[in-house]
Amino acid sequence: MKLLVDAGNSRIKWWVPECQAHGVVDRLALDDLAGEIAAVIDISKLSSVRVSCVAGKSIETQLRGELGFARDLDVKFARVSSPLPILTVAYREIHRLGVDRWLAMLAVREKFPDRFCAVLDAGSAVTVDFVTEAGVHEGGMIVPGVQTMARALWSNTSDVAVERLELVPRWCPGVDTYDCVRQGVSALYTGLVNEVHSYIDGSAERHLSPAIVVTGGDRHWFTQAFSSPVVVDPHLVLKGLLVLDELEK
C-alpha cells in the first residue's frame, strides 16, 4: 500500500488509496499524524510514502521522521518536473512553481485530458492556473487567500476581532466594520472570478467545454461565484500524487 500526504500551510491531509482510508490533522499537531494513521491502517503493509509539502523545510524534515514509522520506509517528496507526458509547465524556473499547484494540475489533466482547464485553489493563497487541451500550462494568478486578507485587515482594526471571515454570494455596501470588510473582500474575489471567465472566453475555440475545477478550504464560495458549471474536488493534491506515482513507474 502507498501512503499519500498533502502538507499545506494550515492542515496536513493523508490518504491510502488501496483501502480508501484518509484523514486530516492541524499542522500544529504534526506529532499526532503518525499515530492517527497507525490507528486506522496496518502500517506494516505500507510499501511507500509520497508527500507534497509547501510548509517549509523544517516541516519536511519532521515529516520525513514521522512518516518513516521507524521502519526505514522510503519517504519521497514530490518535486516539480517538466515536461511530463500530460503537462508542460509555463514557469521558466520550474522549481519556483508551488508543488501543490503542479500536483493539482496533474490531477485535473488526468481527469480532463482533452479539455482546457482552469484550476482554482482557495487556501491561504488563492491560486488560478490555466492548462490547454494539449497539456500546456499557460501560467496563472496568485492573490492573498480569504482568511489571509482578513487577518491583514483585522491587524490594523483594534475594535474588530473575528476568527473567520464569511463571504457573501453578492456584495452590497456594508453597514459596520466587519460587514464592510466581508463585502469588500467578496467584491474583490468576484472580480477575480470574472477575470477567469474572461480569460477562458477569450481563448481559442474548442471542441469541448472548458473544465473549471475548484479546491481548497474556501472552495465553497468560489463554487457558487462562477456562472459556468464547476467541478469541486477537495483532494486534488493527493490525487496528483497518485498520478505522479503512476507516471514515474
From Swiss-Prot:
Q: Which residues form a coiled coil?
A: none
Q: What is its EC number?
A: 2.7.1.33
Q: Known InterPro entries for this protein? A: ATPase_NBD, Type_III_PanK
Q: Which lineage ranks, top first, belong to the organism behind this chain?
A: Bacteria, Pseudomonadati, Pseudomonadota, Gammaproteobacteria, Cellvibrionales
| GO BP field | coenzyme A biosynthetic process
Q: What is the protein's species of origin?
A: Teredinibacter turnerae (strain ATCC 39867 / T7901)
Cystine pairings recorded for this chain: none
What catalytic reaction does the record list? (R)-pantothenate + ATP = (R)-4'-phosphopantothenate + ADP + H(+)
**Chief localisation class:** cytoplasm
Q: What is this protein called?
A: Type III pantothenate kinase
Task: Cite the binding residues for K(+).
Answer: D121
Under the heading Gene3D superfamilies, the entry gives: 3.30.420.40
The record's note on quaternary structure and interaction partners says: Homodimer.
Kindly give the HAMAP family that the UniProt entry links to this protein.
Pantothen_kinase_3
Q: Where does ATP bind?
A: D6, A7, G8, N9, S10, R11, I12, K13, S124
Needed cofactors, names only, are: NH4(+); K(+)
Sequence similarity:
Belongs to the type III pantothenate kinase family.
- Active-site positions on this chain: D100 (proton acceptor)
Write the gene name. Answer: coaX
Quote the subcellular location field of this record.
Cytoplasm
